[in-house]
């Protein structure tokens, strides 16, 4: 018997990511699923834990970690609620603004609680972001193409935004493309973040994919990561659940918990 299991609440358990995460937690010897947040009418009898419709019903639940795999429009409120009630948030929902992340980090420090907002839980995607950060020192001309299933609500993806932000830390100030470039169709060249172009693709059959394409005189470099199914995110989620128990503030990005 394993003592001191980490007690986990899962918000958003009915989604594809959420249902996969629930099974991972149920099968993990060091985790204990203690509650679910979602619509009760859709609950399978296989879940032998309480299910709540409203987060306020969880105020007195005994738990360590709040795993949030909900939707961008509620993720900030959910994360704040978790911290406010002494739970360590592990958040896979994207769409946070820079200001929202800053406020949550500040609040977590006040509460002395660990937490994690991860634009991507796939270890390969985290490595892609770190490799891109190194490559941009030598290849400042770069564009990002992110590809996801057609049910994804936000664009560009949190992974693409995080990749651009990391590259901006190392990329020299640089004008990319023709000075007199004009779009004959608005948006044809994609969105711009930190001087880099991001292109979003949404198609059925895709899960989560990203290319970072670098160009230079006479050569090019393409870095790509593919998640073929949602099991690719479970190692990172499990790592996040364990690691937030060891820190006293919220981190933005799974790379903070890897030896990179």
Swiss-Prot record:
Residues engaged in binding NAD(+): 12-17, 92-94, 118-121
Active site, per annotation: 148 (proton donor/acceptor), 152 (proton donor)
Organism domain of life: Bacteria
Substrates-to-products reaction catalysed: (S)-2,3,4,5-tetrahydrodipicolinate + NAD(+) + H2O = (2S,4S)-4-hydroxy-2,3,4,5-tetrahydrodipicolinate + NADH + H(+); (S)-2,3,4,5-tetrahydrodipicolinate + NADP(+) + H2O = (2S,4S)-4-hydroxy-2,3,4,5-tetrahydrodipicolinate + NADPH + H(+)
Any one GO molecular function term: NADP binding
Assigned GO CC terms: cytosol
Residues where (S)-2,3,4,5-tetrahydrodipicolinate binds: 149, 158-159
Entry's EC annotation: 1.17.1.8
Biological process (GO), any one: diaminopimelate biosynthetic process
Main location per the UniProt record: cytoplasm
InterPro entries in alphabetical order: DapB_C, DapB_N, DapB_N_CS, DHDPR_bac, NAD(P)-bd_dom_sf
Pathway assigned in UniProt: Amino-acid biosynthesis; L-lysine biosynthesis via DAP pathway; (S)-tetrahydrodipicolinate from L-aspartate: step 4/4
Keyword Kinase: no
Keywords assigned by UniProt, alphabetized: Amino-acid biosynthesis, Cytoplasm, Diaminopimelate biosynthesis, Lysine biosynthesis, NAD, NADP, Oxidoreductase
Subcellular location: Cytoplasm
Pfam families: DapB_C (PF05173), DapB_N (PF01113)
Function field: Catalyzes the conversion of 4-hydroxy-tetrahydrodipicolinate (HTPA) to tetrahydrodipicolinate.
Similarity remark: Belongs to the DapB family.
This protein's name: 4-hydroxy-tetrahydrodipicolinate reductase
């Amino acid at each position: 018997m394993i003592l001191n299991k980490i007690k986990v609440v899962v918000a958003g358990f009915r989604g594809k990511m959420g249902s996969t995460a629930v099974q991972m937690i149920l099968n993990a010897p060091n985790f204990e699923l203690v509650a679910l947040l979602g619509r009760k009418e859709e609950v399978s009898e296989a879940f032998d834990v309480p299910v709540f419709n409203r987060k306020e019903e969880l105020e007195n639940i005994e738990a360590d970690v709040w795993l949030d795999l909900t939707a961008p429009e509620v993720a900030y409120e959910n994360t704040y609620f978790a911290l406010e009630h002494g739970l360590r948030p592990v958040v896979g929902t994207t769409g946070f603004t820079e200001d929202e992340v800053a406020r949550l980090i500040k609040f977590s420090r006040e509460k002395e609680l660990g937490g994690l907002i991860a634009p991507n839980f796939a270890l390969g995607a985290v490595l892609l972001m770190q490799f891109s950060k190194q490559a941009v020192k030598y290849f400042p001309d770069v564009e990002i193409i992110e590809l996801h299933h057609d049910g994804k609500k936000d664009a560009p993806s949190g992974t693409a935004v995080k990749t651009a932000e990391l590259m901006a830390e190392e990329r020299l100030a640089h004008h990319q493309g023709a000075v007199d470039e004009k779009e004959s169709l608005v948006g044809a060249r994609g969105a711009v973040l930190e001087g880099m172009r991001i292109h979003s693709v949404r198609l059925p059959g895709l899960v989560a994919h990203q290319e970072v394409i670098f160009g230079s005189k006479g050569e090019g470099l393409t870095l790509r990561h593919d998640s073929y199914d949602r099991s690719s995110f479970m190692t990172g989620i499990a790592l996040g659940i364990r690691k937030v128990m060891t820190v006293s503030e919220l981190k933005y990005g799974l790379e903070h918990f890897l030896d990179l």
